[in-house]
Curated annotation (Swiss-Prot):
Ranges in a coiled coil: none
Protein name in the entry: DNA mismatch repair protein MutS
Role: This protein is involved in the repair of mismatches in DNA. It is possible that it carries out the mismatch recognition step. This protein has a weak ATPase activity.
The keyword DNA damage is annotated on this UniProt entry: yes
Keywords: ATP-binding, DNA damage, DNA repair, DNA-binding, Nucleotide-binding
GO biological process, one term: mismatch repair
Pfam families: MutS_I, MutS_II, MutS_III, MutS_IV, MutS_V
CDD domains, alphabetized: ABC_MutS1
InterPro entries: DNA_mismatch_repair_MutS, DNA_mismatch_repair_MutS-lik_N, DNA_mismatch_repair_MutS/MSH, DNA_mismatch_repair_MutS_C, DNA_mismatch_repair_MutS_clamp, DNA_mismatch_repair_MutS_core, DNA_mismatch_repair_MutS_N, DNA_mismatch_repair_MutS_sf
Length: 891
């Protein structure tokens, strides 16, 4: 085995299951099984070393500048990659170049700009569940204190390497999936020994099993204290069951240190999520309401986030997504945000000026993360300088504002004048990504560098003049001076002119069509030029290191600046939407009243032409009705109406204005939406089972302060079963929970509940019939609907005319209530079709035989008390009744 392959195997052993990208000169190479895997995933050519040997070594590679491109493909395919770099200059190396693994890249540990979506956060999360013994103990304690979690909790921590954000919290185990859906991590760590956490293979994030020692309590606390520079963790707010959150946070930090092999100085605080309660939204509701992603395509476009995101900075866009994923439930905190939005709505010029300034800033959050982890380059530092240059104008426009939020943001925009001046004077306007590319320090910044550069440039001019002089003296017109790393500078002469070579030319290399020479004079100047070049490069690298270190010293204050820029952008974005689309400021209350006048669906309000969307009111109170039963035909707008109420509530609690003419909203603690039909085939659950599971969660966890949205509950089973369930669910919500509820249903029978339940009110969607056509008015009116108009909707959907006409015929026969001898509805076959049964009719058994009067008579007869003759007579009578039809039976 060669020394290089021995070095490779040592690195491979250290990186575990990650594919190893091994730097060799200008290429990254993969060997053995890694090469075979990568060739298939990345489309690389699979070749081999030592092809003539008995066991050639499989290999594949790519140019070093394509690293980001191939890392991205690999991560998307679910793999991890270890990057092994050359950590010394090959020219200075004595023997084998020293190499080290500088980082391990996984879905949750991306920092490079080319690997990240600028508008999306990229979280690494960890889950920790206590042991069975600890769980049982906690459950006993919870029983004594009436803890709603029952003591069955998990710790979840999440961090973003590209920003330094770090949070953790304690959550009921039942909410694990919901919380992960809220966070939206790219990768989730779980303890390989914990059988109680079941990684969901259908999740949008990847799962990584970690050893139990990485969750050790003592190590977690020690590591976190050191990282955060605190003596203990008591001041962070992790109290009841807080150890599970601490252990999850420790696992995150352990993984980051293991994979990054460098500084994590931008992780300066750990936020206790439980200190700031937020509106609870389960995973199903997030999907149903399409808050951040559409259900059909999974994209931002068409979702609520997509239409309200008018941010002009990447960090503002990410913060807005965070706010929308976790709306507030504290009235003061909501008002704090809304006041700032209000001030921007009222001042168009101010808002426009601020958005213009923000548009010239770069992604400071992620730039600082690369500074902290030691992966920054000259272009990053230049972009930090440009961002700092815009701060004075931004700070001036935020000065002396009425809003407490804007006042605080102005105070957090630290100008850092010394750092800004240094970076601006040091760096060229156009800088390379990597410091190794050189030529990024501005002329005049460093006199020593300027001298070395001038010397190098002067030497190169001399070489050009020397070439011309040799051409003139020798008469060789095509003589040229060249350079390579082996021979340095040389004179190249074609074979046709070899006879003209002067005596002082020393031959160094013979090629097919030419020969290469050196001269003492040429070598002397070469040493001067190369020495000046190398010294200039070394000086420039040293200056870059100083700039990077000085920027690193400002890390904490610059992170505060980045957050202030992002929040300013979020507030201005919400104000921009409100001003453009005439949204209004909602009034937030702590009671259960919901009063929306002229409400509009926020997505449709923005995407449809102005005036096209039909606004509707929604009033919920103990006096007018807390449960609104909405009936009406499909396509009339029932689902849109109930969704818009939920989204308006969510926007209000985010701190946004809302699409309405006025809105008074009692703050909700939870929003539930059981909307739409979908199955979970991968989990073995039918559409109806999914519907019932989601409904059960609502009934078990909703409170009187919750907002519940139900759409067509019970349609996945038989008519009577579905109606019975819908009826009982409505009663339970009314009697046991008292939550504000909007229930869109096709069961018109539910309208009768208004007569018996005082807080139930009927609404319907207005339609107009004209010449066998149905016109949907999309207007919500009091009262229940009396028709479903399903056949008309089917025609609008493109159902063939003959099918539609046959449906009308069948409907007419069903409404006429024709029945056979067993009391089953009968349908005559279409003309030209011969029936199979007696009387050429179809018998429908929608409700089974159990309701037939003859069956009921047989069930009640006492056979044991009958004589054989009496039994025979009963049978004869039953047969006669059966032949005579249902009326004879009833008579």
């Amino acid at each position: 085995m060669t020394p290089m392959m021995r070095q490779y195997h040592e690195a491979k052993e250290a990186c575990g299951d990650a594919l190893l990208f091994f730097r060799m000169g200008d290429f990254y190479e993969l060997f053995l099984d890694d090469a075979k895997v990568a060739a298939g995933i990345l489309g690389l050519t699979l070749t081999s070393r030592d092809k003539d040997s008995e066991n050639p070594t499989a290999m594949a590679g790519f140019p070093h500048h394509q690293l980001d491109q191939y890392l991205q493909k690999l991560i998307r395919a679910g793999f991890r990659a270890a990057v092994c770099e050359q950590v010394e200059d090959p020219k200075a190396a004595k023997g084998l170049v020293r190499r080290e693994i500088t980082r391990v890249v996984s879905a949750g540990t991306l920092t490079d700009e080319g690997l990240l979506d600028p508008k999306e956060p990229n979280y690494l999360a960890a889950v920790f569940a206590p042991s069975q013994k600890a769980r049982e103990k906690a459950q006993k304690e919870a029983a004594k204190t009436n803890d709603p979690s029952g003591g069955d909790v998990v710790g979840i921590a999440w961090a973003e390497l590209s920003s330094g954000r770090f949070e953790a919290g304690v959550f009921p185990r039942a909410r694990l999936d919901d919380e992960l859906a809220r966070i939206g991590p790219a990768e989730v760590l779980h303890c390989e020994d914990d059988a109680s956490v079941h990684p969901d293979p259908t999740a949008t994030w990847s799962w990584t099993a970690r050893p139990a020692w990485s969750y050790a309590a003592a190590d977690a606390e020690k590591s976190l204290c050191k990282q955060l520079s605190v003596a203990n963790l008591e001041g962070l707010g992790f109290e009841d069951n807080g150890d599970v959150a601490i252990r999850a946070a420790g696992a995150v930090l352990c993984y980051l240190k293991e994979t990054q092999r460098g500084s994590l100085d931008h992780f300066r605080s750990l936020t206790c999520h439980n200190r700031s309660p937020v509106l609870q939204i389960d995973a199903a509701t997030r999907r149903s309401l399409e808050i951040t992603r559409t259900m059909r395509t999974g994209s931002r476009e068409g979702a609520l986030l997509g239409v309200i995101d008018r941010t002009v900075t990447p960090m503002g866009s990410r913060m807005l997504a965070d706010h929308l994923a976790a709306p507030l439930i504290d009235a003061d905190a909501i008002t704090y945000r809304t006041d700032a939005v209000d001030e921007f709505v009222r001042n168009n010029n101010l808002r426009s000026d601020i958005r213009t300034v923000l548009g010239d800033t770069y992604d400071l959050t992620r730039l600082l993360a690369r500074v902290a982890t030691g992966r920054t380059g000259p272009r990053d530092l230049r972009q930090i300088a440009v961002t700092l240059s815009g701060l004075p104008a931004l700070k001036a426009r935020l000065a002396e504002r009425d809003s407490a939020c804007l006042t605080r943001l102005e105070s957090e925009l630290h100008l850092c004048p010394e750092l800004r001046e240094q970076l601006e004077s040091a760096l060229n306007d156009e800088c390379p990504l990597s410091a190794a590319d050189g030529n990024f320090i501005r002329e005049g910044f460093d006199s020593e560098l300027d001298t070395l550069r001038e010397l190098a440039r002067g030497g190169k001019r001399w070489i050009a003049e020397y070439q011309q002089r040799q051409m003139d003296e020798t008469g060789i017109a095509n003589l040229k001076v060249g350079y390579n790393r082996v021979f340095g500078y040389y004179l190249e002469v074609s074979n046709a002119h070899k006879d003209k070579i002067p005596a002082d030319f020393i031959r160094k290399q013979t090629l097919k069509n030419c020969e290469r020479y050196i001269t003492p004079e040429l070598k002397e100047y070469e040493e001067k030029v190369l020495a000046a070049d190398e010294k200039a490069s070394s000086r420039e690298q040293m200056l870059f290191t100083l700039l990077r270190e000085n920027t690193h010293k400002h890390l904490a204050i610059l992170q505060e600046v980045a957050n202030a820029i992002a929040m300013t952008d979020v507030v201005a974005s919400l104000a921009e939407v409100a001003a453009q689309h005439h949204w209004v400021r909602p009034t937030l209350t702590d009671d259960s009243v919901l009063r929306i006048e002229g409400g509009r669906h926020p997505v449709l309000d923005v995407t449809m032409a102005q005036g096209e969307f039909v606004p509707n009111d929604c009033i919920q109170s103990p006096e007018t009705g807390m449960i609104l039963l909405i009936t009406g035909p499909n396509m009339a707008g029932k689902s849109t109406y109930i969704r818009q109420v939920a989204l308006i509530t969510l926007l209000a609690q985010t701190g946004s204005f809302v699409p309405a003419t006025s809105a008074e909203i009692g703050i909700a603690d939870r929003i539930f939406a059981r909307v739409g039909a979908s199955d979970e085939l991968s989990r073995g659950q039918s559409t109806f089972m999914v519907e019932m599971v989601e409904t059960a969660r609502i009934l078990n966890t909703a409170t009187s302060r919750s907002l519940v949205i139900l759409d067509e509950i019970g349609r996945g089973t038989s008519t009577y079963d579905g109606l019975s369930l819908a009826w009982a669910i409505t009663e339970h919500l009314h009697e046991q929970i008292g939550a504000r509820t909007l229930f869109a249903t096709h069961y018109h029978e539910l309208a009768a509940l208004q007569e018996t339940l005082p807080r139930v009110a009927n609404l319907s969607v207005a339609v107009k019939e004209w010449q066998d056509e149905v016109v949907f008015l999309h207007r919500i009116v009091p009262g229940s609907a009396d028709k479903s108009y399903g056949i008309q909707v089917a025609r609008l959907a493109g159902i063939p005319v003959e099918v539609n006409e046959r449906a009308k015929d069948v409907l007419a026969q069903l409404e006429a209530d024709h029945r056979d001898s067993l009391d089953r509805p009968t349908i005559a076959p279409p003309s030209g079709v011969n029936g199979k049964g007696s009387g050429d009719t179809y018998q429908l058994t929608l409700f089974g035989y159990a309701d037939h009067p003859l069956i009921q008579e047989i069930e009640t007869v006492d056979i044991d008390s009958m004589s054989p003759i009496q039994a025979w007579q009963f049978l004869q009578e039953a047969k006669a009744k059966l032949s005579a039809g249902p009326k004879a039976v009833k008579g």
